[in-house]
Design a protein with these regions (language model features):
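Predominantly extracellular beta-rich ligand-binding scaffolds that present long acidic/polar faces
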Residues: 1-109
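C-terminal accessory segments
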Residues: 87-147
Length: 147
């Protein structure tokens, strides 16, 4: 699996509390453990105060297992076990445009000054979720390119 330019975020609302990691990766299933290769490039994994470690990695057995975070922001107290990392920032608030708990208003575009700006690899896709082109060279992390 190869995930590019993902923004994965979870925030509590007045009705629901955020209490589980936004990403859980495991090579175990109902029929036992299997091979796993997953690469996350130019991604953001973030949540509010409900969870300290937003990424959970679980390896079972002795099968082939590779999880790699390449240019990413993780809300994480420490690097998860069983992963490789390249240019990963831990606990660097990505500064989303709006995370308004009271009004249940969320906008995961990046503010100016976000540590995610210009920190990605030039790997594509060529456009963000709004249809805006991504520049050659250092792209923003996440699914939106700041305009």
């Amino acid at each position: 699996y190869h995930f590019l330019q993902c923004t994965v975020a979870s925030f509590s609302t007045p009705v629901l509390q955020h209490q589980f990691p936004v990403l859980s990766v495991s090579n175990a299933g109902d029929d036992g453990a299997g091979d796993l290769q997953a690469v996350f490039t130019n991604c953001i994994f973030w949540g509010d105060v409900g969870v300290a470690d937003e990424v959970l990695i679980s390896r079972q057995g002795n099968t082939a297992f590779q999880v790699h975070f390449d240019h990413a922001i993780l809300k994480q107290e420490h690097y998860p076990d069983n992963v490789d990392t390249t240019s990963v920032m831990l606990n660097s608030d990505p500064l989303f445009l709006k995370t308004d708990y009271s009004n249940r208003a969320y906008d995961f575009h990046l503010q100016s000054g976000s540590p995610a700006l210009g920190q990605g690899k030039d790997t594509g896709p060529a456009m963000d979720l709004d249809g805006n082109g991504r520049p050659a060279g250092k792209q923003d992390l996440g699914c939106y390119e700041r305009q």
